[in-house]
């Protein structure tokens, strides 16, 4: 599985050219993309500036010598490469298994070309088998948990050891065990309107390409070619 993730990440790095501002994703597959960008800077003299999606990726990029800038200092990003936990046939996805969904969506939004790198196990007919992360402010989080519970969403707080995980943005994550999300766009809008929810892990209609690594090789799926 790690070999497939590496293939996907390295393949995505081929889309990066000199002069680009690039979004550096978070997670086990995006890790290999960031590593390959670091290698190209060192060995090929690649000239890029990165914008990171988590403190983990920031540390990785700094260690590789990738020049970084703040999302606040730019207006657009040429290319962002990130992982995904699930991708359906309509190119909707669930992200946030690494607890970086808020920063990931902030970086994805001003991106001209948004690419996901996944192994073939992440392709699904319907989203929801992977728990849906919902980032919530700490104030009122327990009340919101009960709201989700009453709605039948089977919520659980994301934990780190015996304490609730706190994101880079100082929020909690409530994971929803939905089983199947029949209408991701509608459910995303519902969460958007829920007071106390900062962001959720439904990335609907955002991705342009999905690079899929499988036993038979690498496939590049284009969102604008989907039916």
Curated annotation (Swiss-Prot):
GO molecular function: ribose-5-phosphate isomerase activity
Keywords of the record: Isomerase
Keyword field contains Isomerase: yes
Catalytic activity: aldehydo-D-ribose 5-phosphate = D-ribulose 5-phosphate
GO biological process, one term: pentose-phosphate shunt, non-oxidative branch
Domain of life: Bacteria
Pfam families attached to this UniProt entry: Rib_5-P_isom_A (PF06026)
Enzyme Commission code: 5.3.1.6
Active site (catalytic residues): 104
Keyword Secreted found: no
Annotated InterPro entries: NagB/RpiA_transferase-like, Ribose-5P_isomerase, Ribose5P_isomerase_typA_subgr, Ribose5P_isomerase_type_A
Coiled-coil intervals, chain numbering: none
Chain residues that bind substrate: 26-29, 82-85, 95-98, 122
Function, in words: Catalyzes the reversible conversion of ribose-5-phosphate to ribulose 5-phosphate.
Assembly description: Homodimer.
Protein name: Ribose-5-phosphate isomerase A
């Amino acid at each position: 599985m790690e070999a497939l993730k590496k293939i996907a990440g390295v393949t995505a790095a081929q889309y990066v050219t000199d002069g680009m501002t690039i979004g550096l994703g978070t997670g086990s597959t995006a890790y290999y993309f960031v590593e390959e960008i670091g290698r190209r800077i060192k060995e090929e003299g690649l000239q890029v500036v990165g914008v990171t999606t988590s403190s983990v990726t920031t540390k990785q990029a700094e260690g590789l010598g990738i020049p970084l800038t703040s999302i606040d200092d730019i207006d657009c990003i040429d290319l962002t490469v990130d992982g995904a936990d699930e991708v359906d046939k309509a190119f909707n996805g669930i992200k946030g298994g690494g607890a970086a969904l808020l920063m990931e969506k902030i970086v994805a939004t001003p991106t001209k070309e948004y690419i996901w790198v996944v192994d073939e196990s992440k392709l699904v007919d319907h989203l929801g088998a992977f728990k849906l992360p919902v980032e919530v402010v700490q104030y009122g989080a327990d009340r919101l948990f009960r709201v989700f519970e009453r709605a039948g969403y089977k919520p659980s707080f994301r934990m780190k050891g015996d304490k609730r995980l706190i994101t880079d943005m100082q929020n909690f994550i409530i994971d929803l065990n939905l089983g199947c999300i029949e209408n991701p766009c509608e459910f995303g809008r519902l969460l958007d309107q829920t007071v106390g929810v900062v962001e959720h892990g439904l990335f609907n209609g955002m991705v342009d390409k999905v690079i899929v690594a499988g036993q038979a090789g690498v496939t590049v799926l284009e969102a604008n070619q989907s039916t």
